[in-house]
């Protein structure tokens, strides 16, 4: 599980890659330089 370096507010497919208040990305997303990437 990869942690987000930056808080990711960008939403893709209607879902945030990092839910507010969470420290890690969920749902197969990870944050990279404030971009949501599906892994």
From Swiss-Prot:
What role does this protein play? Inhibits voltage-gated calcium channels (Cav) in rat cerebellar granule cells. Has insecticidal activity to crickets (Acheta domesticus). Is not toxic to mice.
Query: What is the disulfide pattern of this chain?
Result: 4-25, 8-31, 17-36
Q: Which family does it belong to?
A: Belongs to the neurotoxin 12 (Hwtx-2) family. 06 (TXP1) subfamily.
Please tell me where this protein is predominantly located: secreted
Location of this chain's protein in the cell:
Secreted
Q: Does the keyword Disulfide bond apply?
A: yes
UniProt GO molecular function: calcium channel regulator activity; toxin activity
Q: Which tissues and organs express this gene's product?
A: Expressed by the venom gland.
Superkingdom of source: Eukaryota
Can you cite an annotated GO cellular component?
Answer: extracellular region
**Protein name, UniProt field:** Omega-theraphotoxin-Ba1a
> Which UniProt keywords are given for this protein, alphabetically ordered?
Calcium channel impairing toxin, Disulfide bond, Ion channel impairing toxin, Neurotoxin, Secreted, Toxin, Voltage-gated calcium channel impairing toxin
């Amino acid at each position: 599980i990869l942690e987000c370096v930056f808080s990711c507010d960008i939403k893709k497919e209607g879902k945030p890659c990092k839910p507010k208040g969470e420290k890690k990305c969920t749902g197969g997303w990870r944050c990279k330089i404030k971009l949501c990437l599906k892994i």
